[in-house]
């Protein structure tokens, strides 16, 4: 009896078409861009400051945002999260990335998912494939199960 076929790329839920990366560490930003493009995300934009990210959000709405919450130009990414919140129920999914997940206020964490640094890119890609949850706190520490 043949084994069941392995899951193929076409069996997986789709990734968002457009992802905005807000990350002040250029090496991490470029590595994320490369990983997401390699996984099939068509349009990846990197912003290194809060102002760049706010401008990008005003220009075009992404499907998802990977947001480093401790940016160098401001101490947090809350201004970006607050703007996304005003976009309503069709707002982009937010993945908050941080080395200190316990420091994210619960009301902010409810707007998206919290991904503790360091994380591997496959974890992020798997998370971006999941359907967007509304009103549920999703805290990810390490690998998705």
Locate predicted features.
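Active-site residues of response regulator receiver
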Residues: 68-70
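Acidic, metal-coordinating helix/loop segments flanking the phosphotransfer/catalytic sites
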Residues: 33, 46-64
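Short amphipathic alpha-helix used as the core "switch/output" element in two-component signaling
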Residues: 78-90
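Two-component/phosphorelay signaling modules centered on CheY-like receiver
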Residues: 26-45
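Acidic catalytic/metal-coordinating carboxylates
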Residues: 49, 75-79
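Non-catalytic signal-transmission and effector/linker regions of two-component phosphorelay proteins
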Residues: 1-20, 27, 85, 113, ...
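Hydrophobic/aromatic residues positioned on beta-strands within the core alpha/beta folds
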Residues: 97-98
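His-Asp phosphorelay/catalytic-motif detector in bacterial-type signaling
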Residues: 61-63, 87-94
């Amino acid at each position: 009896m043949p084994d069941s076929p392995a899951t193929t790329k076409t069996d997986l839920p789709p990734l968002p078409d457009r992802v905005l990366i807000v990350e002040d560490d250029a090496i991490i930003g470029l590595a994320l861009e490369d990983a997401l493009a390699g996984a099939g995300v068509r349009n990846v934009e990197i912003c290194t400051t809060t102002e760049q990210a706010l401008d990008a959000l005003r220009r075009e709405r992404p499907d998802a945002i990977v947001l480093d919450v401790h940016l160098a130009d401001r101490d947090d990414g809350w201004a970006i999260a607050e703007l996304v919140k005003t976009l309503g129920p069709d707002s982009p999914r937010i993945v908050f990335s941080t080395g200190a997940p316990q420091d994210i206020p619960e009301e902010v964490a409810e707007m998206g998912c919290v991904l503790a640094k360091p994380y591997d890119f496959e974890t992020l890609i798997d998370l971006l494939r999941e359907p967007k949850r509304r009103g549920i706190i999703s805290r990810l520490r390490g690998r998705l199960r």
